[in-house]
Amino acid sequence: MSDSDNNTKSQQNNPTQTDEKSGEEIQSNQKPQRKFTAVLNKKKEKLNEDLSELDKLKQQLAHFQNQFRLAVADKENVKRIMQKNIDDTSIYAISNFARDLLSSCDNLETSLKNLKEDDSIHAGVLMTYKELLNTLERHNITRIDPIGEKFNPQFHKAVSQMTDEDKDENTILHVVQPGYIIKDKLLRPASVIISKKSD
């Protein structure tokens, strides 16, 4: 009989020996599996911690991006407000000076109406008047001469009414004194005579 036959017979004769060996084999196989499971669980735990940290960082990033957008918007608002203040200040500074010049324009215009065209000084007064109007226009000061327009209390001052059946009521018939605006701000309203229907 060979040794292997003897081992087989001895194993068959002694079943507890076979059970002990297979139990040891199972235990020795379970040790690496437990280690693997423990390592895997630690890795999962670490991954969950990292994912949680990533979520926190994403929330912080979104918060900082929102803060940045708000800061940029605030900066743009401040810039726009400052530019408007600068524009308003320059308009205000020019307004007082321009208002003083308007009486000179009115005087030159009155002189032109009273002078005859063949009068020797008419050409000089006309040239001075046109140059003054051009200077005002270069500084965004525009003349309001609203004949035929509908009366607008924002830009016109009614000094009188005149009956006119051909025109709609409150139509400007005559301009007594022209008005002026600087950019979109009223410098002086136009003094006007407006139409009315007969009673």
From Swiss-Prot:
Gene3D superfamilies listed in its UniProt record: 3.90.20.20, Head domain of nucleotide exchange factor GrpE (2.30.22.10)
First-listed, main subcellular location of the protein, grouped into a coarse class: cytoplasm
Keyword Cell division carried by entry: no
Localisation per UniProt entry: Cytoplasm
Ranges where the record places region Disordered: 1-36
GO CC list: cytoplasm
Keywords: Chaperone, Cytoplasm, Stress response
Bias kind Polar residues: ranges: 1-17
Keyword Hydrolase: no
InterPro entries per the UniProt record, alphabetical: GrpE, GrpE_coiled_coil, GrpE_head
One GO BP: protein folding
HAMAP family per UniProt: GrpE (MF_01151)
Family: Belongs to the GrpE family.
Subunit structure: Homodimer.
Function as written in the Swiss-Prot or TrEMBL entry: Participates actively in the response to hyperosmotic and heat shock by preventing the aggregation of stress-denatured proteins, in association with DnaK and GrpE. It is the nucleotide exchange factor for DnaK and may function as a thermosensor. Unfolded proteins bind initially to DnaJ; upon interaction with the DnaJ-bound protein, DnaK hydrolyzes its bound ATP, resulting in the formation of a stable complex. GrpE releases ADP from DnaK; ATP binding to DnaK triggers the release of the substrate protein, thus completing the reaction cycle.
Protein name from the UniProt record: Protein GrpE
Organism: Ehrlichia canis (strain Jake)
